[in-house]
Amino acid sequence: MIKLGAKELRTIKPQKGELKKIKKHPIYIILDNVLDTYNVGAIFRLGDAVAAEKVILCGQTETPPHTRIKKASINTTEWVQWEYFADTKSAIDHLRLTIDHLQIIAIEQSSKAVPYDKADYSFPVALVVGHETDGVSKEVLKIADQIVEIPMWGVNKSLNVMVSLGIVLFEVMKAARFK
């Protein structure tokens, strides 16, 4: 395994030919009013890690270029495709019009949620994560095809938005690989 130091991580700059060789997965990561810029940057890193098609920033979510997003993303904002929409419902409506058979999955604690490891995942998929305090908006939960949640056994009943997304993203990759 290769271990890179902080300086090396922050100075990685892939060549255009290198980027074209990467097979993108039909995964769209939607941020529904995620406020913490470090979460936004870390989500760009997750998008890069799974070769997601696009990160979609909505509402009050800050957009690149932003110093803290860039730092947390270790420059992945430079090559991970992203788009901004004023509201999340408009983003989802746009994606549904342009991508056939798109599955919208909200990651949220809800009485309608199924455990993330029991959900039915297929490509193309859009994963929606929400505001750090308020979660995914009710409007988005109503139009999601599925709501998934991560079981919690301790005293604390919530995880950081980026951590939750990472867990579900890798479950999506695992599940989709076998279809």
Summary of predicted features, one role per range:
Residues 1-179:
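Post-transcriptional modification and biogenesis factors for structured RNAs
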